[in-house]
């Protein structure tokens, strides 16, 4: 279903379902023979959510009819698991480095089913602020509480739509804009219109004191490539048609219906112009760094995103 300006969702629908797909990829990596990351809670979320297309990533085998009709699908799915593993490791290492350097405020924008507040060994005194839709955060908190999980930090949930006045909600939750902070925007930007992305970073700029850090998964140069989008859409349509015959009650959303394909400023360029020291790593380079490589003989097997890491150095104080 196409997006609307004020849409909201449960964890099993629309944008929420994509968080379950990512959790399934983390579960698959965690349960693999040589995992790059460990997320013991990913499987917990899947079990709580029940059956859905997100379980494909975590399942050892596809239905035989689909595997035979779409032989590229399984290596594509493994490529996405490898991509998500590298992405997760990138943000894990970013946050751990920031807190080891003395940063004690962590802000996770559109936290979804991110479980870092429960699984990373944060330094003592670290506060993690998780921002997302109220029903998404409620599902996560309830699921982990029933499982008996406890945060490894001081966790503050901030139930707010990022299209609304989230800076006010963050401040009211205790965030100190005059102390350094570490921010993440992981799997977020394509779900925002270009104007909303611009506003997001402008707001971060008002809240991030000198010494703050940010990590971003940013759309790559092929994000607006219509030919690539059409190839991906046709592949998924064939899978939907096959699935409709096998399991007519299982819905497979088209993630492209949830994204905003609009021209937008390069994230690294924007941060560089606003007083941040920036490092940009293309996705293939990041995957190779972690010894994860996309299938070489399948076009568009993994996202051609860019991973941006930056630290604010200029001395302008954040707005009061």
Curated annotation (Swiss-Prot):
What is the superkingdom listed in this entry's lineage? Bacteria
Write out the GO biological process terms.
methylation
Residue ranges, annotated region (Disordered): 291-320
Which residues are listed as membrane-spanning? none
Record's keyword terms, sorted: Methyltransferase, S-adenosyl-L-methionine, Transferase
Q: Which residues form a coiled coil?
A: none
Signal sequence interval, chain numbering: none
Q: Which family does it belong to?
A: Belongs to the UPF0677 family.
**Protein name in the entry:** Putative S-adenosyl-L-methionine-dependent methyltransferase MAV_4558
């Amino acid at each position: 279903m196409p997006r609307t300006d004020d849409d909201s969702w449960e964890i099993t629908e629309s944008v929420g379902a994509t968080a379950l797909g990512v959790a399934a990829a983390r579960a698959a990596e965690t349960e693999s023979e040589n995992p790059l990351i460990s997320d013991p809670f990913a499987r917990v979320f899947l079990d709580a959510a029940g059956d859905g297309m997100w379980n494909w990533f975590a399942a050892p085998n596809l239905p035989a009819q689909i595997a035979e009709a779409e032989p590229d699908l399984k290596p594509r799915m493994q490529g996405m698991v490898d991509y998500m593993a590298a992405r997760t490791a990138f943000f894990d290492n970013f946050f751990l480095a920031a807190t080891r350097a003395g940063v004690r405020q962590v802000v996770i924008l559109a936290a979804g089913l991110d479980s870092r507040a429960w699984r990373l060994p944060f330094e003592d005194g670290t506060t993690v602020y998780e921002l997302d839709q109220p029903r998404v955060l409620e599902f996560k908190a309830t699921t982990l509480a029933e499982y008996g999980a406890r945060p490894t930090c001081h966790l503050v949930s901030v139930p707010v739509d990022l299209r609304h006045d989230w800076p006010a909600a963050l401040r009211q939750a205790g965030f100190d804009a005059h102390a350094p902070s570490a921010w993440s925007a992981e799997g977020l930007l394509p779900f925002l219109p270009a104007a909303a992305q611009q506003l997001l970073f402008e707001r971060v700029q008002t809240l991030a004191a000198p010494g703050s850090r940010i990590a971003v998964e940013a759309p790559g140069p092929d994000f607006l490539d219509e030919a690539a989008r059409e190839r991906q859409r046709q592949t998924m349509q064939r899978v939907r048609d096959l699935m409709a015959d096998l399991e007519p009650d299982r819905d497979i959303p088209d993630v492209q219906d949830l994204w905003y394909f609009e021209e937008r400023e390069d994230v690294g360029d924007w941060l560089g112009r606003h007083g941040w020291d920036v490092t940009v790593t293309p996705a293939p380079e990041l995957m190779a760094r972690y010894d994860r490589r996309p299938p070489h003989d399948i076009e568009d097997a993994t996202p051609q995103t860019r991973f941006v890491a930056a630290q604010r150095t200029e001395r302008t104080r954040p707005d009061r």
